[in-house]
Regions:
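Active-site acidic/histidine proton-transfer and metal-coordination neighborhood
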Residues: 8, 42, 72-167
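N-terminal pre-domain/capping segments
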Residues: 1-110
Length: 167
């Protein structure tokens, strides 16, 4: 419920909210390669945003996932010149997907990796697989300097996902 006190808090914080440009807003243009990853940095900078959130596959042939180390470094350098943060996103939580996203994040100087589990089957089995994925991220990348965000993209209830993260 919005109360007068809550409204005041919101107004006090509005100028410091960390707003990011999300590549999904440009999804079709990125699929058609009319907007490329580096373009997102320009758009975010022009709009005084904190940074960009970009999927490893956004931009098709020109996506971060298809860039070599030199190109990834150049992307990160441009973001730093523009004083922008980078959040890398991937659409799975299995090892290879996480490893790819983390490699890209580290090579671009990103601060965060967002992922979500995409499994189907018996709930008990799915929960077990997701728990293993989260454990892999924790054990492998806890000292990477990255922040990891798990997105609710399955038919799990919030408390189920929270309990998996807390394990």
């Amino acid at each position: 419920m919005v109360t007068i006190n809550n409204a005041r808090k919101i107004l006090q914080r509005v100028d410091t909210l960390p707003l990011y440009l999300h590549a999904y807003a440009f999804h079709l243009n990125m699929r058609l390669e009319r907007v490329l990853p580096a373009d997102l940095l320009d758009i975010a900078s022009e709009n005084n945003l904190r940074g960009v959130k970009i999927h490893v596959l956004d931009g098709e042939r020109f996506s971060l996932g298809n860039m070599d180390d030199k190109e990834l470094s150049a992307f990160g350098d441009k973001a730093r010149r523009l004083n922008l943060d980078i959040h890398i996103e991937t659409s799975a939580s299995y090892k290879a997907s996480i490893d790819e996203a983390v490699a890209i994040a580290l090579k671009t100087g990103a601060s965060s990796v967002r992922f979500y589990p995409r499994y189907e089957g018996n709930l008990r089995d799915v929960l077990s697989i997701i728990a293993n994925d989260i454990a892999y991220v924790r054990e492998t990348y806890q000292d990477s300097g990255l922040t990891f965000t798990i997105e609710q993209h399955e038919d799990l209830k919030s408390h189920e996902l929270v309990s998996l993260v807390k394990e």
